[in-house]
Amino acid sequence: MYECIQDYLTNHKDEKNIYVNKCISIVGSPLSAGQSLSGVNKACDNLRKFGLHDVIKAVGWGYEDIGNIGEKIPINGFLKQENIEKENDQINNNNPSYYNNIKNAEVIGKFSEKLFQTMSSELKKKNFILNIGGDHGVAFSSILSMLQTYNNLKVIWIDAHGDINIPETSPSGNYHGMSLAHALGLFKKKVPYFEWSEKLLHLKPENVAIIGIRDIDKYEKIILKKCNINYYTMFDIDKKGIYNIICEALNKIDPNKNSPIHISLDIDSVDSIYAPGTGTIAKGGLNYREIHLLIKSISDTKRVVSMDIVEYNPLLDESDKAVHGDSLPIDPNATKTGKLCLELIARVLGNDIV
């Protein structure tokens, strides 16, 4: 029924990535303004503390740690829902060509521009870009920066949620639930403080596959179908298996099997049994083996050029215990979700069982 995965993936362990050097640019993106919980901005430094650099070296890669992009928090803190229109009316002077219902638009827009500039600069080095969030709002700049260099970029968006609301349909005004729609150019108006991005190349719907969704808002369902986006729910994964799903997804978005690939991994795609440290939990997610096989299968193409890992919230995480199979140099005090994040980073870099 499906093209054999071996026909798509390149399984020679010694073959190099055809697009990037064996060196990683680590970019910390501690954006938290795209959602409402504190703690997600601590993920970058937590992963460093738990052994990020040692893990990268252990799997044979070099790295350059660029540090963290600064998030400028307003004096009065982030906005509550009831104050969104007041803030954005002040920003755009009631200009009808602008949206006025995106929470913390100024903070997010300015942060996103800095992130875009940083990643664009790092791309000149031909390094693999590892973008550690932060909330999933950071993916907008990540994807757009990659697209300006790799205009045929394909995106695998791994998430419990669609993140494809537009401001007209968003029930919360939280940007992290709209970032994919924004990257796809689906917004009908301008966004305050995102003017820098208006003329940039945006992602085409046929070049993205969403995997693992199980918590979709009413209007997101309409948008997904209307835009003919490739998506795979947890029901699809249960019926077909994760192995067949990633094979099908790759063949659909990249039939010529030669394009660079960006992975945008929201850790809430994983079931909370394995990844409790995240703010928007939905029951029935990917299990431990499924997420590892998914990342490994994409990595085996030898064409992954960048990865977001987002929505890890250390303040919500749980302790973990060491087991005999733990072979990576991860701090024994690492919490459950933090440890999984590091394992998946190693996996995308080619770490294998044998």
From Swiss-Prot:
Binding site for L-arginine: 165, 172, 217
Domain of life: Eukaryota
Amino-acid positions noted as binding Mn(2+) 1 in the UniProt annotation, renumbered to this chain: 136, 159, 163, 266
Keyword Manganese tagged: yes
A Pfam family that the UniProt record links to this protein: Arginase
PROSITE patterns to which the protein is assigned, alphabetical: ARGINASE_2
EC number: 3.5.3.1
Record note on disruption phenotype: Mosquito salivary gland sporozoites have a reduced ability to infect BALB/c mice. Parasite load in the liver of C57BL/6 mouse infected with knockout sporozoites gives mixed effects; in some cases, the parasite load in the liver is not affected and in other cases, it is reduced. In infected BALB/c mice, causes no differences in blood parasitemia levels and in the onset of morbidity. Severe reduction in ornithine production during murine erythrocyte infection.
Keywords: Arginine metabolism, Hydrolase, Manganese, Metal-binding
Catalysed reactions listed for this entry: L-arginine + H2O = urea + L-ornithine
EC main group: hydrolase
Assembly behavior: Homotrimer; oligomerization is dependent on Mn(2+) binding.
Protein role: Catalyzes the hydrolysis of L-arginine into urea and L-ornithine, which is a precursor for polyamine biosynthesis. May play a role in parasite intra-hepatic development during the host liver stage.
Name of this chain's protein: Arginase
Source species taxonomy: Eukaryota, Sar, Alveolata, Apicomplexa, Aconoidasida
